[in-house]
Design a protein with these regions (language model features):
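Bacterial N-terminal signal peptides
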Residues: 8-20
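N-terminal secretory signal peptides that target proteins for export/translocation
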Residues: 1-5
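Short helix-onset patch at the extreme N-terminus, typifying the N->h transition
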Residues: 6-9, 57
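Beta-propeller-forming repeat regions
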Residues: 21-391
Length: 391
């Protein structure tokens, strides 16, 4: 499905410098998983066997699959089947992350597939045995994002997840939650749930961001939501301010409404003024943008980029400021890098075309000391990574 370009830019100043790909060395594309039958929404990377090569963990065609680097030999570690949760699973997780849930020193897998669950990494992750499946939360529903973060500042990671479905499908409709790991995650039926945005996140909420925005020492949480016929109150960017007691309801701050197809919003100091800003994308619409703190003026960066459904923020060129990477979700998507000059002015580099992505992450895939780009291809049905030519 191709989108029609917007007639006009949505708001305020557009700051974008177009930089040709030929001006610098091209990024090399490496295929981890060739196209499969179904869609691939998310992929994460870690060296599970400590052999010096990153492995990739993803889900597709009804299984969670561990791809052993550097040859990417597949090892199925879980098969989705009805009966493990109240809702029938889909062929793949909509989003995933890694977290040492049980504190044993290895990275466990957390996924959202009509329920939120975790798979315990065994001592021998490539032995052929299935990783043990356990429930995180089977009551929230519509968790388009699972994000680790120490919400209550107790030195232990928690999990942030959304519950976007309506009241006919979940007792926590149009809400956002953070979930505490129970004392014994191996035996607990579910994690400790805290609804911090109680029916306060309408529409098709997508991805969350985590970080202290107002400088009070307490991390806050941002979110974006698409709209549409099924999500009539979406199309917004907002953040929630953490109170002294994080188990209570948080204060919502709407950044912008009427943002067609809003999906991603992440906090970072983009102009090096010591104040937190937000970088955002409209992944079910058009454009990338940022909100300049502390007043959060909306500044368009590239208002016509189609379907930038994924986002990550890191210093890609190692010049001391935060850059952005994104990719369109359709099969003809554009892989784009926005290099920051340190003042919030961004130079666009088109790294590739005809590559879709639901999930894009910056990670050093080849161990050379710079950030590469890992992409789960969704409409492209593949997993690829792009090698940073910096080193």
């Amino acid at each position: 499905m191709k989108l029609a370009l917007p007639q006009t830019a949505l708001t305020t100043t557009s700051i974008l410098l177009i930089q040709s790909l030929s001006a610098e060395s091209a990024w090399t594309k490496h295929v981890i998983q060739p196209p499969v039958q179904g869609k691939i929404h998310s992929a994460v990377a870690h060296d599970w066997d400590a052999d010096g090569h990153l492995d990739v963990l993803s889900s597709f065609d009804g299984e969670v699959v561990l791809l052993k680097g550097p040859t990417w030999a597949p090892h199925a570690i879980h098969r989705f089947s009805p009966g493990l949760a109240r809702s029938k699973p889909r062929p793949a997780c909509i989003h995933t992350c890694l977290m040492d849930v049980d504190g044993d020193g290895d990275q466990d897998f957390i996924g959202s597939n009509n329920t939120v669950f975790w798979l315990e990494c065994p001592d021998q992750p490539f032995s052929g045995q299935a990783w043990t499946y356990r429930t995180v939360d089977d009551e929230i529903l519509g968790s388009h994002c699972v994000l680790p973060g120490d919400v209550n500042r107790d030195g232990k990671l928690d999990l942030i997840a959304n519950s976007s479905r309506d009241a006919t499908r979940t007792p926590y409709p149009e809400s956002l939650a953070w979930l505490e790991v129970p004392k014994d995650p191996h035996t607990a039926e579910s994690w400790v749930r805290h609804i911090f945005a109680d029916r306060d996140a309408p529409g098709g909420s997508h991805y969350t961001g985590f970080g202290d925005v107002n400088g009070d020492g307490r991390p806050d949480i941002s979110c974006a939501a698409k709209g549409g016929e099924k999500f009539p109150e979406g199309n917004w960017f907002a953040w929630w301010q953490q109170p002294e007691d994080p188990t209570q309801v948080w204060t919502k701050h709407l950044l912008a409404a009427d943002q067609l197809g809003a999906t991603n919003i992440l906090p970072a100091d983009l102009n090096n003024d010591g104040v937190v800003d937000y970088f955002a994308t409209r992944g079910h619409g058009f454009g990338v943008l940022w909100f300049k703190g502390p007043d959060f003026e909306l500044i368009e960066v590239d208002p016509t980029l189609p379907s930038p459904h994924s986002l990550d923020l890191v210093d890609m060129d190692q010049d001391g400021d935060i850059d952005a990477i994104t990719c369109g979700k359709e099969a003809d998507g554009i892989v784009a890098l926005y290099l920051n000059d340190g003042q919030g002015n961004f130079s666009k580099r088109t790294l590739d075309e005809n590559q879709g992505s639901y999930d894009t992450r910056a990670i050093d895939m080849d161990g050379d000391g710079d950030f590469d780009i890992l992409i789960a291809g969704q409409a492209s049905k593949n997993i690829v990574w792009y090698e940073n030519p910096l080193r």
